[in-house]
Amino acid sequence: MSNVNLSVSDFWRVMMRVCWLVRQDSRHQRIRLPHLEAVVIGRGPETKITDKKCSRQQVQLKAECNKGYVKVKQVGVNPTSIDSVVIGKDQEVKLQPGQVLHMVNELYPYIVEFEEEAKNPGLETHRKRKRSGNSDSIERDAAQEAEAGTGLEPGSNSGQCSVPLKKGKDAPIKKESLGHWSQGLKISMQDPKMQVYKDEQVVVIKDKYPKARYHWLVLPWTSISSLKAVAREHLELLKHMHTVGEKVIVDFAGSSKLRFRLGYHAIPSMSHVHLHVISQDFDSPCLKNKKHWNSFNTEYFLESQAVIEMVQEAGRVTVRDGMPELLKLPLRCHECQQLLPSIPQLKEHLRKHWTQ
């Protein structure tokens, strides 16, 4: 009889997929999107958006939990966009893990994440993935840069932004649950085909959407959700990440005369701290808009050494308010400071500096 009871208990435990809308700058708690239920959000206390250009009913969201995407309908007058492409009034498009939804006018970035929940009838629902009480530590592993895949081979001018990678060196890997398929970053980290280097502390992969001829991501095996979650205990890890970044430059671009920068985005596009190692040519078809450019050429990009010094001196990283506004600044050449009106003209201008 006891064996039957155990079997029944196991039988009634079922897994349910749930969807969450997550503000990338962690200004408020994530919002649950019930399966196939229309949820309308916009300006208000739930989102903490006070911008009058954002309607109180800006978007309608309907989660297709079984299919792994959310249908987004723009209800408000001002533009809502997904990956910088405007949806259009009364139009509906799919928002998938790895894409960024800007609520209005390229502001207020959101992503969606899916979780598996174990649920017992009559009992409290238990999440398969744990999260702390700190909203900054909510995992958001779906992001454009972090999708399973790789970047351009160095020097390629192809219109493609994704080609196979060389296999990384063998090293022990700290096992971690990959969770839902949308967590492309963790999958990429664990996949030998995606790796160019790994050791006990970090792994290096090519950015799937490189913004330059050489663009790598250095990621710690330890899960750190954002720069705000970095503490003094991570100091040696940050130093090691910087050292590995420099090593990758020597190993894979040693003959190149290109200049490199190592740094972090003030507000990361995924919930796993990652160091960008990027050449300063910005010669890539994946560099498509002002947001891409300014994320690497304004104070939005925090130098690796500066981050290390902050943690060394203060025990934490200070990210000032208003960072998203930097992404809207005019296009300015990082070499000569000349203002350019468009990305195509900026790219043409940059060619002059390649020959110098």
UniProtKB/Swiss-Prot annotation:
This is Aprataxin. Changing residue 336 to A: Abolishes DNA-binding and enzyme activity. Its main location: nucleus. It comes from Homo sapiens. The histidine triad, also called HIT motif, forms part of the binding loop for the alpha-phosphate of purine mononucleotide. Interacts with single-strand break repair proteins XRCC1, XRCC4, ADPRT/PARP1 and p53/TP53. Interacts with NCL. Interacts (via FHA-like domain) with MDC1 (phosphorylated). Residues 38-87 form the FHA-like domain. Its EC number is 3.6.1.71, 3.6.1.72.
